[in-house]
Amino acid sequence: HLDKYNQEIRKMRTDGVDVLPILTKEDAANALNHKAATLLAIEEGGAIDGSLEALRCLYELGLRAMTLTWSNRNDIADGVNEECSGGGLTTFGRKVVQEMNRLGILVDVSHIAPAGFWDVINLSTKPIIATHSCAKGLCPHPRNLDDKQILAINENDGMIGVTYARQFLNQDINKACIDDVYRHIDYMLNLMGNDDHVGFGSDFDGTTLPHDMQGVQSYKEIVEYLQSKNYSDSTIEKLTHKNALNLLQKVL
């Protein structure tokens, strides 16, 4: 099953889809010249089963981003559900971050407990990402990022992908809507003082969406909503793709 990703790429190409698997800085720079681009990522670093060699093998198969933990503890660090233990990166976890930096694999800190987050910030020599997180200042869910974490990612030259998980957008999940997506984006942009480090984070395959979103087809509505809030075309382009592609060019 390890090579399923590359099998799918080959199948798409056989079916006539102009798809680019992003493996290098040059691929990230060229992505907009193709109909579609993909990036192989793993959510939950426990997938490498305590082995740096497994991480290297996955890199050779195309892995270019990995979430260090899910919400529970693994041999890399504690997830947010383990926050009371105060656990940060383990000795092995520190080696994982260093090897990901060396190889050119994007370090994803969504799901990690605060202690581990700060360990990564202090250890990583490359920009990091929180692929699917929102602002704790608007919705105090443990999975969201507080102001200090948001500012740290800004200083790290990294990126936050705002997720559409309704429980992270609004404390009243039944009221979560596209306006909340806008509010979290706007909150982060104002806090950072720039529009270079925030983007769309989605999590379409792993959560329940707000009532006015159906899936990837809802991106048009999000963009139109941002336009209605007088966001410039330049800022919207950064949010939809440019910030992510720029980040990949710094890391891969």
Where are these regions (language model features)?
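Histidine/acidic residue-rich metal-binding segments in metalloenzymes
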Residues: 50-60, 82-129, 142-156, 179-196
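Conserved, mostly hydrophobic/aromatic
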Residues: 24, 62, 107, 132, ...
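Short acidic/histidine-rich active-site segments
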Residues: 163-164, 192-216
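Histidine/acidic-residue-rich catalytic or RNA/ligand-binding cores of hydrolases
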Residues: 77-78, 118-124, 140-145, 169-185, ...
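Mid-to-C-terminal alpha-helical segments outside catalytic/metal-binding sites
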Residues: 214-252
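Active-site environment of divalent metal-dependent phosphoester hydrolases
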Residues: 27-29, 47-48, 72-77, 112-118, ...
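A metal-dependent hydrolase metal-coordination microenvironment
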Residues: 1-52, 68, 77-85, 89-94, ...
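Structural preference for beta-strand elements that scaffold enzyme active sites
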Residues: 20, 37-41, 64-65, 104-108, ...
